[in-house]
Amino acid sequence: MAASLGFRGAASGLRYWSGRRRPVGSLAAVCSRSMASKTPVGFIGLGNMGNPMAKNLIKHGYPLILYDVFPDVCKEFKEAGEQVASSPADVAEKADRIITMLPSSMNSIEVYSGANGILKKVKKGSLLIDSSTIDPSVSKELAKEVEKMGAVFMDAPVSGGVGAARSGNLTFMVGGVENEFAAAQELLGCMGSNVLYCGAVGSGQSAKICNNMLLAISMIGTAEAMNLGIRSGLDPKLLAKILNMSSGRCWSSDTYNPVPGVMDGVPSSNNYQGGFGTTLMAKDLGLAQDSATSTKTPILLGSVAHQIYRMMCSKGYSKKDFSSVFQYLREEETF
């Protein structure tokens, strides 16, 4: 989520590519696999994010070989002429470039290492890109297993949400072998306007976890500020306008406001349906908590945000967008 948070430009030390700039580095040095431009690409995971991401690859001329644990979501792709595989292993047998977009660490482990996983049929030299948001340690373990099979694994989680996935303006944070970055960039640039090389495998996940922790904190802060203003008699649209002209401005206030009726086209104005689920935010904050524990880093606000989103999940908000924290604050008498 939130490509606007922390990724307005290239950070120091990061390899960076924007859809508005020329790619970094020469494609001439990339292996023949990545230069096979319009050969089929495998895509596994066609949920809220994966579906529009896959469609953007198709728009750029890439034929796809698709798989999802729920066959019904593949129907529209099959009707459009794309291939649908019977398992992740089947995808790996037919494609040497595969992108996965899955909900959790456990899902990624199953898709890669399970009984019918990618590693059962992966070809030497294949490029495997995981855009799921998972524990960095899981990415590192998967990379080791993939390397044993003679293939390449890169983690490339995304930020920007469903809207950016649809428009092809995602931010990708990429971790892996640097000389494979251009090969990954060829595909990721079809789905995102910002593709950043962050370092070794797991670095992309670490960057994404930091971003989502900040996003959760800023969303809670925006919801609290808006709620306070409304209870003080301020018009919510006026308050949002003031915030967005002032130092409190952030992505949660100017692009994804949590108050119903303040903005069109956002989950808060659609009963908090669609978008980025509260369950997923709680999961990502759990990853941040684990990372903080392993690195002995204090995350005081991150820990509180984790507690809030866990409480929301236990009180019926699990399937609503994470901006529903505003509704939660309004309904909780204890706050």
UniProtKB/Swiss-Prot annotation:
Subcellular location: Mitochondrion
Keywords noted in UniProt: Acetylation, Branched-chain amino acid catabolism, Mitochondrion, NAD, Oxidoreductase, Transit peptide
Enzyme class name: oxidoreductase
EC number(s) from the headed UniProt entry: 1.1.1.31
Keyword ATP-binding attributed: no
Presequence boundaries: 1-35
GO term, biological process aspect, one: valine catabolic process
The name this protein goes by in its record: 3-hydroxyisobutyrate dehydrogenase, mitochondrial
Lineage: Eukaryota, Metazoa, Chordata, Craniata, Vertebrata
